[in-house]
């Protein structure tokens, strides 16, 4: 029998942004901020040590990326000039080759997923 394992860890950061590609009367056209939450998922076979990846090792990969965005204007970050939740999830996925999926929450009710195919 073959079993696939996934682990997910949640991270948080606060940042401001505006969406330059929306209509002028759209509320997100103006600068505003979010308390973002991201979930990083890793899918892989179980290793001999009982882990897919140790959460501590995952933190060493993700924390520096979160630090690049925390308390920043996301529009100023290369690759996030149009910082939709979709683009933010893609930004993380492109920088975390080990991740199988990234989920970015702008609010508790609104999120976007980027999934490696």
Describe each region flagged by the PLM.
Residues 1-117:
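Charge-rich, low-complexity N-terminal segments
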């Amino acid at each position: 029998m073959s079993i696939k394992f996934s682990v997910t860890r949640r991270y948080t950061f606060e940042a401001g942004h505006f969406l330059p590609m929306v209509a002028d009367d759209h509320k997100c056209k103006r600068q505003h901020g979010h308390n973002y939450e991201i979930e990083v998922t890793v899918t892989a076979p179980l290793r001999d040590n009982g882990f897919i990846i140790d959460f501590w090792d995952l933190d060493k990969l993700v924390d520096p990326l979160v630090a690049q965005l925390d308390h920043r204007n996301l529009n100023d970050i290369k690759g996030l000039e149009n910082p939709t939740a979709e683009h933010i999830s893609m930004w993380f996925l492109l920088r975390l080759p080990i991740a199988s999926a990234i989920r970015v929450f702008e609010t508790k009710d609104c999120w976007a997923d980027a999934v490696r195919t």
